[in-house]
Amino acid sequence: MATIGMGDIKKGVRLELDGNPYKVTEFQHVKPGKGAAFVRVKIKNLKTGKVIEKTVHAGDKFEVPELEQKTMQYLYDDGEMLQFMDTTTFDQIGLTHEQVGKETFDFMIDGMEADILFHNGEAISVEIPQTVVLKIVETPPNFKGDSQGGKKPATLESGAVVQVPFHVLEGEMIKVDTVEGKYLEKAK
């Protein structure tokens, strides 16, 4: 199994800790005036969704978890589980809201393709594309003089609320960054 060290740590890197797969969500390289450099990281447990903070020192090594990734289609939310279907075998699996994570679920719509991560044959996590195109279902109307480059809230078809420029109208399709939860541009 491959290993990674302190210098390999960056956002999105996956590592194994105590037999559980984690994903780095934030990191900060620290070079103190005295002593060795280290990295402060926030890592998300891919099985439980829980985020912990850890300090990584120069000699620390982590194994890279053996994860299988399958592209599946999101079907629906039955209240307890989010249902996904393998489009080649038509097998269905369910993941809890905790496994998916609110930051991911906020940008999911029925029929969307998502990458499901499997660890030891068990579905553990969902990853959606970094940018998605969604329709605005509700946003306040524009008023004359709204040209100062301000922003207003817009509710998307997925239920997420993002800040959009005043010129963006209800019913328009926009491109959204799912990692930052931000408006990028009008969809072309």
Swiss-Prot record:
MF GO annotations: translation elongation factor activity
One Pfam family this sequence matches: EFP_N
GO biological process entries: peptide biosynthetic process
Subcellular localization: Cytoplasm
Pathway: Protein biosynthesis; polypeptide chain elongation
PROSITE patterns: EFP
SMART domains: EFP, Elong-fact-P_C
Keyword Phosphoprotein: no
Example of a GO cellular component annotation carried by this entry: cytoplasm
InterPro entries, sorted: Elong-fact-P_C (IPR015365), NA-bd_OB-fold (IPR012340), Rib_uL2_dom2 (IPR014722), Transl_elong_fac_P/YeiP (IPR020599), Transl_elong_KOW-like (IPR013185), Transl_elong_P/YeiP_cen (IPR001059), Transl_elong_P/YeiP_CS (IPR013852), Transl_elongation_fac_P (IPR011768)
Keywords assigned by UniProt, alphabetized: Cytoplasm, Elongation factor, Protein biosynthesis
Family: Belongs to the elongation factor P family.
Function: Involved in peptide bond synthesis. Stimulates efficient translation and peptide-bond synthesis on native or reconstituted 70S ribosomes in vitro. Probably functions indirectly by altering the affinity of the ribosome for aminoacyl-tRNA, thus increasing their reactivity as acceptors for peptidyl transferase.
Protein name: Elongation factor P
